[in-house]
Amino acid sequence: MRQIRRTARPARLCICAAIAFALGSPAQAYYHYVHYITGGRTGPFTIQQEKFNIRAGGTVSFFVSDRGPAVYAPGDSFGSLLGQVKQALAAWDSVSSPNLRVKFGGLESDGQSSTAPGGDVVFQELPPGLYGLGGPSSNGTTIVRGAVILSNNTAAGAGPSYLENFFTTAVHEVGHALGLQHTWTGSAMSQDVLRNTSRARPFDADDVAAINMLYGPAGWQNSFGSIAGAVRFANGGAVSLASVVAIGPTGAAVSSLTNPDGTYRIDGIPAGNYLLYVHPLPPDAVPADETGLRLPRDQNGEQFLPSGVFGTVFYPNTTDPRQAKSLQVSQGDVIREQNFTVQSRGSVPAYDLITASYLDTNTRTPLYDLTNRQWWKVYPAYANNTQAGIFIEVRANSGDAPVPQSVTMLGGGTASGDYLQIYNDPAGRALWVYFGMPIFAGVGPRHLVLSYANDIFVMPQAFNLVRRPAPAVTSVRSTFDGSVTVTGGNFGGDSLVYFDGIQAVRSTAFSGNDLQGSLTVLPPAGTGGQVARVIVYNGDGQNSTFASLNTPPTYTYPNGGTPQIDRLSLTSLPAGATGMVDITTQNMAFVDGQVTIGFGSGDITVQRVWVLGPNHLTANISVAADAVAGSSEVSVISGFAVLSQTNTFQVLPRNFSLPVISAVANANTAQQTIYPGVFAAIYGVNLANSPSTVQVTLGDQLMTPQPNGVLPGQVNFFIPANFPAGPAILRLHNGNVAANPIALQIDVPPPTIQSVTNASGVAYDAAHPAFAQDVVSVYVSNLDPTVLGNPGRLQVTVNGQSMPVQSLTPAANGLTQVTFFLTQSFGGAVLNLAVVVDGSSSAPFPLTVR
């Protein structure tokens, strides 16, 4: 059984024991670490949440302890684990940007000093049933450090790091470190026993609302709606810390907890129809050991306690979901005065319930009747919308499941009598629930309501409705060029291939159909002789381990020598300076986009990495002006290969007379990249002590400064039209002394997006939004024709998150049709869609994604 608890408030790295000691009190459904800075004990209150205090667009980097776990599960590795942490951070970055960037900073040593806010990932022995810990260390309401503690034994807890549960656990704990607390909606911030997320869908609308409440850009709420009101007992007393949930019958669930005066407000609700219900916190929400919700505090630091147990009701005060009022939530609107009156109860009827389905091992579809069938049990449950009957098992995470009188599927039917059966096994009493449903009744999470004598229990995201069977891998075959072809059934354009938990790069489009298809990928860089498990994940949340009675198929990496670092061209910089470091190694296999270079401290930022060869990297780095002088660890991580050297890089005292290149951009601020035939602008300090003698070279070619464009803080220069694309070394001499050189990426001119349509050819606009799992066509002009022969050079991003590209096809009028699969819902937000070629991005195209 899966169960997770967590705590919060870790201090800065000292490393394991000190963080465990510092983990003190943990708090809000999308809920935060809440302080009421005015209002005393009765209100009205002024609310302030703990969060990182960084500039808009600033970065919080997380560093992983170089000690790693003490024990690894068979086949597991530090490289695989780091891959999961990196992906978890990238997932948060995809929903927290543009105001907050969340990055993986590499490895760090014990006791590393840093003035920059950030986070640490460390490993400790955890009690049974505890998968991880996470939370912030704060100065008042400002988070100064976040910590994530994972098990030092990957054979226990969340299991081997290459499995999906380790990834979703990492996402959950990073959320705590960023300032989010538990929720009860099945989202990423729900405890593991309730959580219904996956690699394909790491978040739900509740998580998006929560992170935007802390770090969203100005006006973010204009793309969402809100609901507000109060919860009171029958005697008029306020109900504190009640969870109020806006739930779409076949869609998202977004929640909040009530204030001590009973008031609540749920922000970040995607536009649509919702039911509203309120429920008490479960008995394990606020345990005595503070491994759950951290209670809010008043201005004197005193806690506010939950008001106690009451009966769950839908608005307006009914236990029958069929009598609940439907609320139409619109963008930018607030629905007010949605008030509840609740009745006290001695206990809740149920909590911590989980669901399961039984997949046929041959068809990989959920079974309705288990008689004489071979099956594989999957948590949480899945149902297939091509089947008229749905069978779901509901059981308690521990012990017997309380037996309700009926079970209702929101937006569907009700099971009772012969369609609600009791099943007993050694693990305890379970419920077998049977529903009828029209075929092709949509896809996505579905919610259940269990009705008891005088109370109800709501299970948001109780099971997932999908349209095809789970994928299955039948063969893994190496090809002559180093790529790997994975063959199987129920693959598609949304299918992603993972080697020991790290995503492989697609080298060709999906080929085949549901019965038999293949995906050709470039495996992540590995070490010689490594045996990697190969798992295929589909966009609907299913993966190829679902109906497998055996371990996943494997891929063995070719034998090779021991990887090592040969040379670092730069081993020190003054505080406030920038520079370029050139790194050469042995026996590595660097792949662009899969390499992390770290300098062990949040004071040192890696701005960009270029892969120049399988054993050759170049990177630009910068040191914070207030950086602590001293040494730090250099790490190079590529796929599963992890290289590090402790105490290798030195931060020196600041040199105030040194010219520093802080940034380089296209002088035309409407363009996002630098390419031949344009003016580029160098920004920094001390750039032109003697403007008439300033020299700029690019790739050892002398550049022509722009007339009147040479200033102490900015130097503009022209890039010749025939200058080659790729990284080039930029040097500047201010007339007295040279700045540290940096690398500058010269891109090809970007493509231009002309139109974006759905699979039926209907153009997307505000009235025609995109939805998760849409097949989207983007028509672009000015695309380099050689990209058609090498589609891996092209990416499509939505809100900065890469989407699976299905095909590139020549279209009419010299355009190119780029087709991609939209893997994730973004809750009705207007997001930037971009087509990126060799790192050169088109201008953003606004796309509304439900």
Model-derived segments and spans:
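Hydrophobic beta-strand segments
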Residues: A242-I247, L276, V407, L496-V497, ...
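Bacterial N-terminal signal peptides
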Residues: C14-A22
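Zinc-dependent metalloendopeptidases
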Residues: A27-A350
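A short tyrosine-centered beta-strand micro-motif
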Residues: G272-V278, R446, S632, A728, ...
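Glycine-centered loop-to-beta-strand initiation motif
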Residues: G229, T258-P270, Y274, V278, ...
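A sequence-level detector for low-complexity, Ser/Thr- and acidic-rich stretches
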Residues: N362-A383, A388-R395, A401-Q405, V466-P469, ...
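Surface-exposed, short loops/turns at beta-strand junctions within beta-sandwich domains
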Residues: P270, I439-V443, P523-Q530, A625-A629, ...
